[in-house]
Amino acid sequence: MKLLMLAFVFLLALATCKGDEFVCEENEPFTCNQTKLFNSGNFEKGFIFGVASSAYQVEGGRGRGLNVWDSFTHRFPEKGGADLGNGDTTCDSYTLWQKDIDVMDELNSTGYRFSIAWSRLLPKGKRSRGVNPGAIKYYNGLIDGLVAKNMTPFVTLFHWDLPQTLQDEYNGFLNKTIVDDFKDYADLCFELFGDRVKNWITINQLYTVPTRGYALGTDAPGRCSPKIDVRCPGGNSSTEPYIVAHNQLLAHAAAVDVYRTKYKDDQKGMIGPVMITRWFLPFDHSQESKDATERAKIFFHGWFMGPLTEGKYPDIMREYVGDRLPEFSETEAALVKGSYDFLGLNYYVTQYAQNNQTIVPSDVHTALMDSRTTLTSKNATGHAPGPPFNAASYYYPKGIYYVMDYFKTTYGDPLIYVTENGFSTPGDEDFEKATADYKRIDYLCSHLCFLSKVIKEKNVNVKGYFAWSLGDNYEFCNGFTVRFGLSYVDFANITGDRDLKASGKWFQKFINVTDEDSTNQDLLRSSVSSKNRDRKSLADA
């Protein structure tokens, strides 16, 4: 009988190993954490599996000029996080970058997405005012270290840390002067590092700075209408987000044009922006909610993808926003249209959308209201789409499937890299609890499972996946109250060891599973049950 049972288990494992037969679960309990059954072998050869970070969140402030997040978190420390945290020191990757590479090597990572700090390379914001040789040395060391370990660098030029001097001089992205300054900064980066960096990202999450930085005032530079937040030093939540978004697109396109004109033929690299994505589900079965869901997709994704693919904003945005939405000149439209070789897509959560036609007074109106939708974490029956992501939202692993398919079918089958996907845990947990982050394994493996599935079923052109994040770091607006890392950072002793969490050990095995790995891993906590495979998704409830 024992031999018969062993034979049955072996046959079950053998069948489940086949990528096209592995079942992806939409909700707990998850079984995808078994690296013997689901691993990098479910993806094509050469698929990049990496981790990600950004300069302000990991480098620390040593050796660079001030940026808008420095000023923002010091002027409004409570907005930097409930713990009043900021990026003054954080992980000190500026001096401890070799530790980062060692952790990535331990993870078996084949790629690393990081950003260059504009105010580190150009402390006074402009190339004409001087280049910092210390920054060149630092980034050369990091890039060379990655290449030596056969890790592919993906380098972001702007991850929200605008030099403060440019914000002071002309209000940063509110002014078209930013286009030339960003172009010059990008040109310098291509010149200095482009012989080794073959994957450039212009701007991280085009949606975020206009909305959180200029509509809500929750992010740097913290502008908004007075009645949205009395602490905002100035702003107009109805108009400024559209101006900033417009200038971001022009700056992005100018950088892409410089790369294609001066460097691409010799350096043989690629360049594109990063989009923050979400999947949206109807709040209920009404046509109004279904229509609101489509509007949410357009105002969230199409706001930027419309210009990038067609050289103009979506018609419904023009109808709803009116003259608050800027126009592209013919020359600008031609420059913006098609200004990407690939798209980086960040994906974390799914929301429900319901119709909201309420007209509010102009002094409390924000650009986020223009889609005439209300976004919620639960639907009309009180159901969430999946397990908790944080105190206010939930995740839905199949959402990544739908997002990838949506971008393929809506925006012309682009080359895609998943440039962020990750899960937070409380920042106040002790070492033992923080490193036993099994819920992060569930999050990562369930999303990777649906990513593999959509690539196979829909032939979506995805070539890489970067987990957020390499290690614990400063989290925008949350300080150190949350941890996203696959490795543990002790912020009371940042020079200490960077220990892999359970999620890091899982990712390590996922990337490079070996025959020596036990089938009955200690990570295998979820049972394989037909009941779980057959149960209805909460997203459909």
From Swiss-Prot:
Reaction catalysis annotation: a thioglucoside + H2O = a sugar + a thiol; Hydrolysis of terminal, non-reducing beta-D-glucosyl residues with release of beta-D-glucose
Keywords, alphabetical: Abscisic acid signaling pathway, Disulfide bond, Glycoprotein, Glycosidase, Hydrolase, Metal-binding, Plant defense, Signal, Vacuole, Zinc
Signal peptide: 1-19
Localization terms from the record: Vacuole
Record: residues binding a beta-D-glucoside: 57, 159, 204-205, 348, 420, 468, 475-476, 484
GO molecular function, one term: thioglucosidase activity
Active site: 420
Disulfide bonds: 24-449, 32-445, 224-232
GO CC terms, sorted: apoplast; chloroplast; cytosolic ribosome; peroxisome; plant-type vacuole; plastid; secretory vesicle; thylakoid
Entry EC no(s): 3.2.1.147, 3.2.1.21
Residues glycosylated per entry: 33, 108, 175, 236, 356, 379, 493, 512
Tissue: Expressed in guard cells, phloem-associated cells and myrosin cells.
Biological process, per Gene Ontology: abscisic acid-activated signaling pathway; carbohydrate metabolic process; defense response to insect; glucosinolate catabolic process; regulation of stomatal movement; response to abscisic acid; response to insect
Additional information: It seems that the absence of a catalytic proton donor in plant myrosinases is not impairing the hydrolysis of glucosinolates.
Family label: Belongs to the glycosyl hydrolase 1 family.
Assembly notes: Homodimer.
Function as written in the Swiss-Prot or TrEMBL entry: Degradation of glucosinolates (glucose residue linked by a thioglucoside bound to an amino acid derivative) to glucose, sulfate and any of the products: thiocyanates, isothiocyanates, nitriles, epithionitriles or oxazolidine-2-thiones. These toxic degradation products can deter insect herbivores. Seems to function in abscisic acid (ABA) and methyl jasmonate (MeJA) signaling in guard cells. Functionally redundant with TGG2. Hydrolyzes sinigrin and, with lower efficiency, p-nitrophenyl beta-D-glucoside.
Name of the featured protein: Myrosinase 1
Organism: Arabidopsis thaliana
Name of the gene this protein is made from: TGG1
